[in-house]
Amino acid sequence: MSLIKPFSGIRPKEKFAKQVTSPNISYIDNYKPNKKLNFLNLLNATEINKSKKILKSLRNKNIIQEDKSNHFYLYRITYSKKKLLGIVGKINLDNYDDKKILGHEETFVERIKKRKEQLLKFNSQISPIYTTYKSKTNSLKKLNHIFKYKPDYNFKSEDKCRHELWVVKNANTEKLLKNYLKNIKKIYICDGHHRIQAMLKTKKKIAPMIVAFPDNQVNILDYNLSLIHISEPTRPY
C-alpha cells in the first residue's frame, strides 16, 4: 500500500501559470501589488473571507480550475543547474499516528489554533506540505521517460528558477509511478508541521496535499538566528 495517493488538484490554466504562482519568500519584497492574479494576494489577505472571495473570483474567471479526475503530479524545479523532482499527491493522516509520516519540529499552540481556524473557514489547502523520503540512488531513472513529454507547465519565475509540472494521465505511467511509490516506507515533514497539527485537530476527514522530494536531491541548510542588539542590560548567570 502506497503512502502517497492521487487527487484532483485545483490549478491555473497554462497561460496564467506564471502570473498566478506566488514568488519565492526571498523575492516577496519585489512583489508588485498590481499583479491581481498572483496567489500572494490570497495568502496575504487580512481576512479569511477576503481570501475566499479572491479564490472564488479566480475560479469564476476560469483562471484556475479543478481537474475532473484524480491524478499524480510530477513537479521539477531547476535552479543553479540543480534539479529537484517532487511527487505531488495526498496522504492519509492515519499514517501520522502510526509513525509512517514523521515530523521533527516543535509546534506552538497558538499557531496551531490559527492554522486550524484558517483551515475550517477557508476549506482549502492552498500550498503543499514540503516532505522528503529516503530514496535509493538513481531510483528515479525509472521515471525518466516521462520527461520526454512536454510538461503541462514550463516557465521561469522572478528568482530565475524554472518550474515544470506534468499531470500524470497515462495509465501505464501511473502504474509505473504507483510501483515506485510502494518503496517509500516513511515520509519526513520538512515544512508544514503546524498545518499538519491543525488538520489532525479538525473533525473533518482531511487528506493533506504534499510534495515529496527524494533525500538525495534535498540540501539541508543551517538556519541560524543572530542576536544583534539587547535593549536592556541583563544580569550574568
Which stretches of residues belong to each language-model region?
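N-terminal extension/subdomain marker
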Residues: 1-150
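Short helix/loop capping segments that flank catalytic or ligand/cofactor-binding pockets
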Residues: 98, 140-141, 197-200, 219-222
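Flexible, glycine/proline-enriched loop segments at strand-loop-helix junctions
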Residues: 101-107, 164-168, 186-187, 226
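A short alpha->loop->secondary-structure connector
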Residues: 147-151, 204-209
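Glycine-rich phosphate-binding "P-loop"
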Residues: 149-171
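Active-site beta-strand/loop microenvironment that shapes enzyme catalytic pockets
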Residues: 166-207
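Class I SAM-dependent methyltransferase SAM-binding "motif I" and its flanking Rossmann-like core
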Residues: 209-227
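Single conserved hydrophobic/aromatic residue that forms the stacking wall/gate
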Residues: 228-237
